[in-house]
């Protein structure tokens, strides 16, 4: 599907919520993911239908926000959204399907898990998962479309919290600091300790660490 390139401006007031008042029957959900690039942990996706009667100020691409601001917005989204769902694809699914298809699977699960059935899913990026509702991809949608911004925040905060929890099980890797991304600290820990069960074997740095451990035996 060809991605839609939206002009760099915020959505109009009629579209700030999940309902398009120019088309009264349209219920729009925003969809985004977090965690495609890390070497460890699941990929997480969220779908959000905003309530136009309960607007949320400050929504933006989660990567442009501080952790403190993301946490505050997370609570507001959960409290005020008409519907939301957060879903994931596991490390095993990432390694079996590849990261792109696992991401599409997580997005599909998020949309299908909504308590309100949308008529349109707006997806951040240039690809759409296979859905039973209409879908459109919006390049840079997480910075442009409020419901996608909200989804990006839910996905990012949820995944970061999951990796902090994984740090309790696997403290040598520093997941609480880098949340699985390929930092010098993480790569050094991989070389020293080898991968653990939540590392993605399909990612090159993890395979290289496995080969290094095998060669040292």
Curated annotation (Swiss-Prot):
Gene3D superfamilies: Ribonuclease H-like superfamily/Ribonuclease H (3.30.420.10). GO terms for cellular component: cytoplasm; ribonuclease H2 complex. A divalent metal cation binds at residues 32-33, 124. It is found in: Cytoplasm. One of its GO terms (biological process) is DNA replication, removal of RNA primer. Residues 26-215 form the RNase H type-2 domain. One of its GO terms (molecular function) is RNA-DNA hybrid ribonuclease activity. The keyword Hydrolase applies. It is an enzyme of class 3 (hydrolase). It comes from the Bacteria. Keywords: Cytoplasm, Endonuclease, Hydrolase, Manganese, Metal-binding, Nuclease. Its cofactor is Mn(2+); Mg(2+). Manganese or magnesium. Binds 1 divalent metal ion per monomer in the absence of substrate. May bind a second metal ion after substrate binding. It catalyses: Endonucleolytic cleavage to 5'-phosphomonoester. The keyword Nuclease applies. It holds the Pfam family RNase_HII. PANTHER family: RIBONUCLEASE H2 SUBUNIT A, RIBONUCLEASE HII. Endonuclease that specifically degrades the RNA of RNA-DNA hybrids. Belongs to the RNase HII family. This is Ribonuclease HII. The lineage of its organism: Bacteria, Pseudomonadati, Pseudomonadota, Betaproteobacteria, Burkholderiales. The gene is rnhB.
């Amino acid at each position: 599907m060809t991605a839609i390139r939206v002009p760099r401006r915020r959505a109009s007031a009629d579209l700030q919520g999940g309902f398009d008042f120019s088309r009264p029957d349209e219920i729009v959900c925003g969809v985004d993911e977090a965690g495609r690039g890390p070497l460890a942990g699941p990929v997480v996706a969220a779908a959000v239908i905003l309530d136009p009667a309960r607007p949320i100020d400050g929504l933006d691409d989660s990567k442009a926000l501080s952790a403190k601001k993301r946490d505050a917005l997370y609570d507001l989204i959960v409290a005020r959204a008409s519907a939301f769902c957060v879903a994931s694809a596991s490390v095993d699914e990432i390694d079996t399907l590849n990261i792109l298809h696992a991401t599409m699977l997580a997005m599909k699960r998020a949309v299908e898990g909504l308590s309100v059935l949308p008529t349109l899913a707006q997806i951040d990026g240039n690809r759409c998962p296979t859905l039973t509702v209409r879908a459109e991809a919006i390049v840079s949608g997480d910075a442009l479309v409020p419901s996608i911004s909200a989804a990006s925040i839910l996905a990012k905060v949820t995944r970061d919290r999951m990796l902090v929890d994984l740090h309790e099980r696997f403290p040598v890797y520093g997941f609480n600091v880098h949340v699985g991304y390929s930092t010098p600290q993480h790569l050094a820990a991989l070389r020293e300790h080898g991968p653990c069960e939540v590392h993605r074997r399909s990612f090159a740095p993890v395979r290289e660490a496995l080969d290094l451990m095998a060669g040292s035996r």
